[in-house]
């Protein structure tokens, strides 16, 4: 019997560079380590941000078959300070990023690919309450200025979060965020009476193929939806040179699909966006290859997190570890 279950695919890229401007000059000085470029912003833009906006799909003898704006097909966030720099120093790439979000809205039932980001990339659990709200509000305002819409999701620096951070996101109108699987503590089925038993997932074994709902501990009327990315596949993209071969990349994504799941599953990964071209040369081309040439043929439905939530909803509740991030074994 044919399996009619859907398999969604979301690839998220977190694109960020720290502010490098000399505060006295309000410009970036020459950075010798970025040679042959003027500075590291310029170098990473040339190696990653621009190529992903005009990424090539080629034959084995390097004949160009298509040119793809990868941002039209992936979930992404850009640091506000990075976009501020790009607006002035890489305007054409900047415009293609904004255009990609507009194009994605029509493909995803009114939901754009772009997510907002806390403004200064600070570790939110270490911030006081006022600074938490400031970072979120500034991030939202910057997003609205650039993308001309309200953000539905927000990326947390290093995915660092705690209960107070998630409550602040909720209070500011954010609907979802993305975390590491190792940040989840326990899950249970959502029921009206809340009597389902909790299952321990604290060692990173949460099922990443669905969304989860988190309720604020001090006020159960407040909730936010959380996605926990596929850890092993994300790690391979970031550290195992998976992006040197588009065929290996799509095979790894297919390995994230399980026939044992009796629901419409979401295969999704999240890494630093710089993986696609800066960390791995021509990684943008492996990405465009699987997005435009392979994903649909392999049974994937390309989507973003907001559209997935509208289509599939949330059936499970999650509790998270008290203070955690994707990059620190002892929390933050």
Question: Which residue ranges define each predicted feature?
Answer:
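Active-site and substrate-binding clefts of carbohydrate-active enzymes
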Residues: 2-59, 69, 80-81, 195-234, ...
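Short, well-structured secondary-structure segments
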Residues: 8-13, 18-129, 134-135, 152-156, ...
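A short acidic (Asp/Glu
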Residues: 20-24, 86-89, 126-128, 157-170, ...
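Alpha-helical packing segments of well-folded alpha/beta enzyme cores
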Residues: 60-63, 135, 139-143, 161, ...
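Acidic, His- and aromatic-enriched active-site or binding-groove loops in soluble protein domains
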Residues: 95-113, 137, 149, 170-218, ...
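Core alpha/beta catalytic barrel or barrel-like domain that forms the active/cofactor pocket
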Residues: 108-123, 146-157, 178-186, 224-233, ...
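CE4/NodB-like, metal-dependent polysaccharide N-deacetylase domain
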Residues: 132-156, 217-219, 254-270
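Alpha-helical scaffolding segments of alpha/beta enzyme cores, especially the outer helices
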Residues: 134, 138-145, 164-171, 285-289, ...
């Amino acid at each position: 019997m044919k399996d009619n279950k859907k398999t969604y695919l979301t690839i998220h890229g977190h694109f960020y560079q720290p502010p490098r401007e000399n505060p006295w000059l309000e410009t970036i000085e020459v950075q010798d380590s970025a040679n042959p470029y003027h500075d590291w912003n310029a170098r990473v833009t040339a190696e990653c941000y621009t190529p992903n906006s005009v990424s090539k799909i080629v034959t084995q003898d390097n004949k160009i078959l298509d040119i793809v704006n990868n941002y039209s097909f992936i979930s992404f966030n850009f640091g506000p300070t990075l976009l501020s720099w790009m607006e002035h120093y890489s305007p054409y790439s900047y415009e293609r990023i904004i255009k990609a979000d507009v194009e994605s809205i029509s493909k995803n039932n009114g939901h754009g690919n772009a997510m907002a980001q806390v403004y200064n990339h600070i570790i939110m659990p270490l911030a006081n309450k006022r600074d938490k709200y400031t970072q979120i509000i500034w991030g939202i305002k910057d997003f609205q200025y650039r993308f001309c819409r309200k953000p539905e999701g927000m990326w947390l620096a290093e995915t660092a979060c705690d209960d107070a951070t998630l409550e602040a996101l909720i209070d500011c109108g954010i609907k979802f965020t993305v975390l590491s699987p190792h940040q989840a503590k326990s899950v249970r089925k959502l029921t009206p009476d809340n009597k389902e038993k909790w299952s321990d997932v604290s060692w990173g074994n949460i099922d990443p193929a669905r969304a989860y709902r988190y309720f604020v501990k001090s006020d159960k009327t407040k909730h936010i939806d959380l996605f926990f990315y596929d850890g092993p596949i994300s790690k391979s993209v970031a550290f195992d040179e998976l992006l040197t071969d588009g065929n290996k990349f799509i095979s790894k994504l297919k390995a994230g699909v399980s026939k044992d799941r009796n629901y419409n599953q979401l295969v999704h990964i999240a890494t630093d966006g710089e993986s696609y071209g800066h960390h791995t040369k021509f990684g943008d081309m492996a990405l465009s290859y699987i997005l435009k040439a392979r994903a649909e043929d392999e049974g994937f439905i390309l989507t973003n997190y907001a559209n997935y939530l509208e289509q599939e909803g949330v059936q499970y509740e999650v509790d998270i570890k008290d203070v955690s991030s994707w990059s620190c074994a002892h929390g933050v």
